Amino acid sequence: MSLPGLELSQTSAEREFVSAPPTQISLSKGSEWRFEVAFGTAIRVKLLSGTAELFGTELAASQTYAFSGTKAAIYTWHGCTLEVGAGDTISTIDGLGSAGMNGGAVRGYGAGGCQSEYTAEETPMVEYANVHFALEAMRQEAKATGKDGPRVLILGPENAGKTSLAKILTAYATKVGRQPIVVNLDPAEGMLSVPGSLTATAFRTMMNVEEGWGSSPMSGPSAIPVKLPLVYFYPLQNPLEAGASVYRPIVSRLALSVTGRMAEDEDTRETGIIVDTPGILSQGKAGSLEVINHIVTEFAINTILVIGSERLYSTMMRSYDNKPTASASAAASDERITVVKLSKSGGCVDRDAAFMKAVRESQIRTYFFGNPIPSTASAALSASASSTTNVTLSPHAQQLDFDSLAVYNYTISLPDEDEDEYDPSQLGTGDTFIPGGSNEAERAEPQQAEDSSFTPSMPGLAGSSGEDATSAANSAVPLKKVPRPAPTVLANSLLAITHAAPSAPSSEIRDASIMGFLYVADVDSEKGKIRVLAPIGGRVPPRAIVWGKKWPGEVVGLVG
């Protein structure tokens, strides 16, 4: 890039970086190596001697691990020596190197090209290990008495290390042969799914060091056994934006599914569940305590872990400590809730909006195209045994008639939303603007039977069943079918295919679990066609589809 008037060239930081030989880092017992790697760059870490773990999952000796776009820490209980070197530059799916992705992230000048890296002697790992041992004692008691195992709720502000603690407790549980159910209630980040997902997964095997939680089922080799998540879709970033009408009912359905699994699976019943929550619930905003209480009640929580907030800890102590749980067996066993305060790790760093956007894009790309990080673990499964082999998936592209789809959108107005943006799905409360339509909100009679492709789900409309309870439940759900023509803003967004029928009531669509996701690559409103990517081939199932317009929002550049 030339500088105007000076006739000089400015060399990019990526070009200035010269790959240095690997660096050896020695850690004393009870210390950890904290590092940050930008998206688009990668480092390689190898355990040369001793023992080490990343968020509770042990690193194998002499095995090279690749990390990109992450902020993490490698801890050692007894001391170890690590070898850290630079990895390959990773290109995005659209073919552009991500050195300038999301604000111009470039390779740093730390070991291996880390943006930041240092060794820390003070860590809260002893506290976290003590929590694991306490939970293990509760599991042994549950096995002896036939009661349910511990149901753990993790609370804390943003960037306090809640998800890291959930990974540590899960890894330690699986290490001793337990099978915990992990529940993610944070729509900002996906767990084994895309952002906007609320998921529950039973972990029977170890987690993937490079990919965090691991990977969901895919048609390709995997060094770590894949996980089978149960997924629900909440297409909003903030659980308080539609807490009463959308978020809490989905949490109830998820809790019901988890409870049913624990009733049928003795191993998961004894091990219990670990619930990760969004940080906004800990900020004291209106409605947050109601959502926390709903989670505590629905999952029959008996252990609340609070990280990094004295105020929240005090509130939880007053509200729940030593109070009876909501478990069905609580009355007979006199089970009580325990509130525990934990220290926030000094390695927790703030993740800005640009980094979180890159995280969301990476999760969505991985869902459709596989893991872009070159991994020697996946290379070991390849016949070529190439050190740069990575798991690449090929999504199926197809063109669909928009009229053949039942696409629904949540009609919730956000404070920072542009109300002038044209979107046919936001016009009116009925189908007045559709040719031949009429405004059902002004009529007392039910919807005509010939319009079977549309189910009344807007506030104030009477359901075809005529039952007051069902009608009231459906009218409370801010879910409306997107009318034709296909809105152009549908492009570059996600569609969630539910298990609900296309004409199911709005409450049933909201509460339905997800089959999979589509990515809308292009929209032709004149022809009524949309071009989508699907993880598998074949026809799109005739099911109700929920549009992730507000969250995870627009994802540009996924395809060329």
From Swiss-Prot:
Binding sites annotated in the UniProt record for ATP: 32, 71, 159-164
Keywords assigned: ATP-binding, mRNA processing, Nucleotide-binding, Nucleus
Domain of life assignment: Eukaryota
InterPro entries referenced in this protein's UniProt entry, alphabetically: Clp1, Clp1/Grc3, Clp1_C, Clp1_C_sf, Clp1_N, Clp1_N_sf, CLP1_P, P-loop_NTPase
Stretches assigned to coiled coil: none
GO biological process, one term: tRNA splicing, via endonucleolytic cleavage and ligation
Complex and partners: Component of a pre-mRNA cleavage factor complex. Interacts directly with PCF11.
Family from the record: Belongs to the Clp1 family. Clp1 subfamily.
Name of the featured protein: mRNA cleavage and polyadenylation factor clp1
Organism: Aspergillus clavatus (strain ATCC 1007 / CBS 513.65 / DSM 816 / NCTC 3887 / NRRL 1 / QM 1276 / 107)
Lineage: Eukaryota, Fungi, Dikarya, Ascomycota, Pezizomycotina
Gene name of this polypeptide: clp1
